[in-house]
Structures are given as C-alpha cells and as structure tokens.
Amino acid sequence: MATLKASFLIKTLDSDVTGDFLSDLERRGSGAVHVIMGPMFSGKSTSLLRRIKSEISDGRSVAMLKSSKDTRYAKDSVVTHDGIGFPCWALPDLMSFPEKFGLDAYNKLDVIGIDEAQFFGDLYEFCCKVADDDGKIVIVAGLDGDYLRRSFGAVLDIIPIADSVTKLTARCEVCGHKAFFTLRKNCDTRTELIGGADVYMPVCRKHYITNHIVIKASKKVLEDSDKARAESCVAATI
C-alpha cells in the first residue's frame, strides 16, 4: 500500500509540479556561478572585466557590482591596479541589488559581475538566488585568503555551488617567482584593511614565511617599546 502511495505521489509530481518547474527553468535559462580568486595583484579584476566585456560582445545584458567599502580608485567603478575601469553599482550588500536596480531591469539581466566579493556577507545567498532561482550567470572575483592566509569573507563558501573556479597567481615582489599569498607590510591586525601596494604585496611561500616572521618581530618590539614608555611615564608621575 505504501509503495502504491509513493508511486502515485511520484507520478503526480512528474506530471504536475516537475513539468511546471522544468518549463519555468526553460523560460529563465540556465544560471551559472564562476569564481575568480587569488592573492592581491594577481589580476582578478582584470580577468573579471575581460569576462564581462566578452559577455557584452556576445549581446548579453550585464551589471557590475562591488562593495561600497572599496573606494581606493573610484566610488562607482571597478578599477584595476593598472587603471582600467568599468562602471558599477557600489553596494553595502548584494541582496538589495534587484530592488535598487529595478525589478524589471533586473529581470532583463543575463550576467552579473561581482568584484571584491570577500566584503559581501550575503555572497552565498545572493549567488544561489541569482543562479538557481533567476537563471543568471554570476562571475565573482575576490580574495581567497586574508593576510594571515585564513579564509576571507564568503568567497570559499561559494566553491561548492560554482560551475568553475579559477585560482590566479601573482609574482613575488621579492624573488619574482609565482606568488600565492598576500603579505601585509605593516603591523595593523584588522582583517579588513583596504589598501594597495602601500599596504600589501604578493609573495611566494618562502618569502611569506620569512617576511611574516620579521613583521611579527617588529610588532613585538614596538609593543615592548610602547609598554616600556608607558611604564616610564607612570614611574615619572609617582
């Protein structure tokens, strides 16, 4: 009896729900998520812009997004380290984009590019909605790790839902070999510290380790110096 009920349910789903669902999918088209990641100065934004321009050349409607936190080169453009720019929407979050862009205009979009994706806390949710529910192509560019080589934001979280993942490398500023990591030049410990070549540099494994040790040692010296200075000031006032 249970088998008959299950069989009836499957047939019902096949004929009604599944048919409507597949029909809806065909109308919307097939969505996709493509991830471009790597350290700073590895050409992520350049690669993203190249992909976006290719989509435009193929006649697709495109929108570019970036985090409003990134104001290094321009507030309303995605700009590469080489100075190449492309107009974009600068947003504090992603899920509000369809409404801000206008639902009619949003529904006509084929492709959405996202730069500096590590700054968006709702990246996973947005990519699922855009690709799975709305049938659009999402091309995401962002850092895969922070200056401590830990997961940064939600970029790594979207790998399980990605159709493709491209990991780029930079060139080590010390030896010229392939660079997989981002080294912070100063002793600031904030996870989010927006900057360019004045704050960060790409390095290989060897020079990440050696330079990181030096920076940590320098930080300790500064902390000890500040502590000694503070103790000296306290002693002088007693």
UniProtKB/Swiss-Prot annotation:
Its main location: cytoplasm. It catalyses: thymidine + ATP = dTMP + ADP + H(+). It is found in: Cytoplasm. Expressed ubiquitously. Keywords: ATP-binding, Cytoplasm, DNA damage, DNA repair, DNA synthesis, Kinase, Metal-binding, Nucleotide-binding, Transferase, Zinc. Its EC number is 2.7.1.21. The keyword Repressor does not apply. One of its GO terms (molecular function) is ATP binding. Disruption phenotype: No visible phenotype. The double mutant tk1a tk1b is seedling lethal. One of its GO terms (biological process) is double-strand break repair. Induction: Induced by genotoxins such as ultraviolet-C radiation (UV-C), and ZEO and MMC treatments. The active site is at E116 (proton acceptor). Monomer and dimer. Dimerization is stimulated by ATP. PANTHER family: THYMIDINE KINASE, THYMIDINE KINASE A. Belongs to the thymidine kinase family. This is Thymidine kinase a. The lineage of its organism: Eukaryota, Viridiplantae, Streptophyta, Embryophyta, Tracheophyta.
